[in-house]
Every structure is written in C-alpha cells, then in structure tokens.
Design a protein with these regions (language model features):
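Structural preference for solvent-exposed beta-strand-turn elements
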Residues: 1-374
Length: 374
C-alpha cells in the first residue's frame, strides 16, 4: 500500500475512531486502525469487537493494499505535523514508512489479515431517520444509563416500538434505578424494523452512533442478527446489542395528576443554575439537596457539615400544598441540560413520589427523578 493524503482529511478520519479503539486490550490489534487503499479512496476501519466503524476518504493512491497501524500513533503524527500532505507506504516484514516532508517515521505494525473483519448483515431492512431526531433521542436518554459495572441490565438504552392512537413511535428509555429518561418520536416506516420485544443498545455504541448522527445527512438504520446497523454516506457502523432484559420500567412512572395545583411551572434556566450552585458544597457523603415547594416559590437548601451550607429561592407558578422533599441535584442538572424548553413543568403527586419533568418544546420527552432522604 502506498498513498498521499491531505493532513486535514487524515486527521478527521483518525480522530473519528479514537473512541472505539481499545487502549488496554489484551488483543493489540484492537488498538490499531485498518487502512485500505483503493482507487482514489482510503477506507479507515476500527473495532473493539462490540462496535465496528468504517468510513472512506479521498486519497491519492499510488499502490492499493491494506495495513494496520496504531490509532494513537497515527493521530499523534497527524496532529504534530505542519505539512499539508502525509505520505504512507507499506514496507516488508510488517513495517510502515510515514513522511510529512519534515520527519520520517518507521513504525512496526500487525498483519492486516489479523484485523477483525467488519461485516454488515445480509438482506437487512433499513429505514431512513432524520439525524437530528437520532441525536435528540440519544442526548435525552444516555445520561440516565448506570455507571455501575454491576448494573449490566441497565448499562444501555432500551429501544422499542410503541403504538399510540394508531400511530407507530420509536421509544428510547434509560434508567439507573434512581432516575429515568424516556422519549418517543414518530418515525416513518418504523414498523418495518423487527425489534421483537425491544433491544438494548450499549452506552459506548450510542455515543458512536451519536457522532455519526451529528454529521450532515440522514441516517439509514436497521436491526438484524443481534446487531444495530447504521449508514450515512459511505460511513458504516455496526453495534452489537446487549444480551440483557430491561426492567419493567412502566410501573415506575406514576400517573400524572392533571389538576393545576399539582403542577409546578418554572423557568428551566434559573432552576438549572440554582442546582449547579447547590453542587458547590456537595460531597460523596452529602449528595442531596432539600427542596421546599410552596405557593409561588421553590427553595433549595444544601448542607455539608464539613463545608457549610447554601440556600436559594426561585419564583415558580404553584398553588398547591407545601411539599418538602430531597433530591440529588446532579440528576436535575443532567435532565435540564438535555432539554430545550424555556418553561418546564414538574409534576409531583406527593412527598414520596418521583418528580416528573416535561416541557412544551421537548415533545415526547419525560424525565423522572426519585426522591432521596436528606
């Protein structure tokens, strides 16, 4: 293999796969990228055996072929050069020569035929989804995935098809046992995708899918053989689904009381900023904030005996009974940051019930935060 490629093009391609590469794997090949030179095209592939990604970039091909190279080393070389083009050539006995008109690198590599092959399931049914919808659904659920290794059943986003009033929707749900985030979106042709009773997408796979969605253009999306497959242009990502049963989350969501005295109307930004200030004196031992809700006010009190306390009151629209509860401010921050509404609604049935969060500009979204003892 022998190529010349624009530095910016190579940097874009190599940067794109860094999140997939395994840094401490017992399989060294998983820390490499596969470079495949075709006629005027360079394919860059990466995998950790759970996620596979491939995209193509324009290149001046001198000789076609394939090589592997450390993804980190190639990224560092590309970042540090001040040359507009980089020359890469395969040498004998698994060596690679790289030149940028200033420095010359001779690097060892692994045989290209040892790189795990990225295979797209055959005869897969795919539908087109707007990228902005994919991004919104991921951003409004991914933060609720558990960070605990023991919580395997919760370590991804659950995706299923639902029917509301005769129309088909795609639903994503995530929970860590202390909070839940859910979003429904109407997707044309979603009925063509076979999800059985729903599927679990791992957090790392969602992050990579989100990167693909944030680029221009719509996404082709499909499921087959325990894999999620997505395409955009020449980019392909294959994500292995989690083999886990998601908990019965529907029983956790209380029925919202629609009477106005139980609904708290509040500006999202002041609440978000106040919750951030509550975090200033937070510690692992003192994580909660006391929330007092009265007629037209919401008061937050955070106390840490080792540091001090912080107290703040903000205006709201509320005409119900006094409510005193405790919450983890981090959970409010994550939910509020993901939302777009200027005005949001908090629905609390009683002092032992979860807090439901919705907003008019966040169509189909529901946030749920469990109370805690403070």
């Amino acid at each position: 293999m022998e190529i010349k490629i624009d530095t910016e093009t190579l940097l874009k391609g190599i940067s794109r796969v860094q999140g997939i590469l395994e840094k401490r794997s017992q399989m060294p090949i998983l820390s490499t990228v596969l470079l495949t030179a075709k006629e005027n095209e360079l394919e860059i592939s990466a995998t950790d055996l759970e996620i596979g990604f491939q995209d193509s970039y324009p290149v001046e091909t001198i000789e076609q072929g394939s090589i592997t190279i450390s993804g980190k080393n190639l990224l560092d070389i590309t970042r540090e050069t001040n040359s507009r083009k980089i020359y890469i050539s395969e040498k004998e006995n698994n060596w690679i020569y790289i030149s940028d008109n200033n420095a010359q690198y001779n690097l060892s590599c692994l045989p290209a035929d040892e790189f795990p092959v990225l295979t797209e399931p055959k005869d897969i049914v795919m539908i087109e989804i707007e990228s902005k919808i994919v991004t919104e659904m991921i951003n409004k659920t991914i933060y609720s995935i558990t960070m605990e290794e023991a919580g395997f059943k919760l370590s991804g986003v659950f995706m299923e098809k639902i029917n509301k009033d005769g129309e088909n929707f795609l639903r994503m749900v995530a929970t860590d046992g202390h909070r839940l985030s859910l979003i429904d979106k109407k997707i044309p042709d979603i009925q063509k995708i076979d999800m059985k009773q729903g599927v679990m997408i791992p957090k790392k796979g969602l992050s990579e899918l989100n990167k693909l969605a944030m680029e221009n253009g719509n996404i082709l999306f499909g499921l087959k053989q325990n894999n999620l497959v997505a395409r955009k242009g020449k980019a392909l990502i294959v994500i292995r689904l989690l083999d886990a049963k998601f908990p019965d989350y529907k029983n956790v969501i209380p029925t919202k009381k629609e009477d106005k005295e139980n609904i708290i109307t509040i500006n999202r930004r002041p609440l978000l900023e106040a919750m951030r200030r509550m975090m200033i004196i937070r510690s692992d031992q003192y994580q909660g904030v006391k929330v007092n809700i009265g007629v037209d006010y919401l008061e937050m009190v955070s106390i840490n005996p080792n540091l001090g306390n912080v107290d703040e009151k903000i205006e709201i629209k509320y005409d119900g009974e006094l409510i005193e509860m405790g919450f983890n401010p981090r959970y409010f921050i994550d939910a509020l940051q993901s939302m777009d509404s200027d005005i949001i609604y908090l629905n609390i049935n009683d002092q032992t019930s979860p807090c439901l969060i919705t907003g008019d500009q966040d169509v189909g979204f529901l946030g749920l935060i469990m109370p805690m003892r403070v």
